[in-house]
Amino acid sequence: MKPRAARAALLVIGFAAARALGAQTAVTTLTITGGSTATFANPTQADYVAGYIDGPTITFTVSTANGGSQPRTTTVEICAGTATLGSGKAISKLLWQPTDNSLPYQSIVTGCTGAVDPARTVGTQTIARGSSWSGGVRLRMMLDWADSAPSYGTTIQMAVSVSP
């Protein structure tokens, strides 16, 4: 092969590789950065008098990569993995609030499937490729004097939706 033909072949391969890199699929990642295995403390008499106990804070980061220069709107949602907390305690007794106080405490709902639901939306941000945003969720358990089970529990799920 002549040197000129070899250079032309390498140049074509270089353009093909550059084009493939430019057409990469957008990747959005939701990373739980804290509180993923936290539990509530045992309630005290003062907690029962107050009617609730504050629980752990879950923190997260949403990041984007690849997929061109178009900004992406990302929405983070929180939900419970079970319909009850066990021992007869309703899931509605578990409350959540974004750490930025953009919403009041509200009851957690079951399941993160389907369309984005305002009842489980922690936050929404439009971010450019290669950018990220962080947030958090505070948990609170409503108490009453009739609560006598030694423990309650559910799996907390978080999901990220991306558009366009």
Task: Report the location of each language-model feature.
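Secreted/extracellular small peptides and ectodomain modules produced from precursors
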Residues: E77, V109-T110
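Extended, solvent-exposed segments with strong compositional bias
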Residues: G114-V116
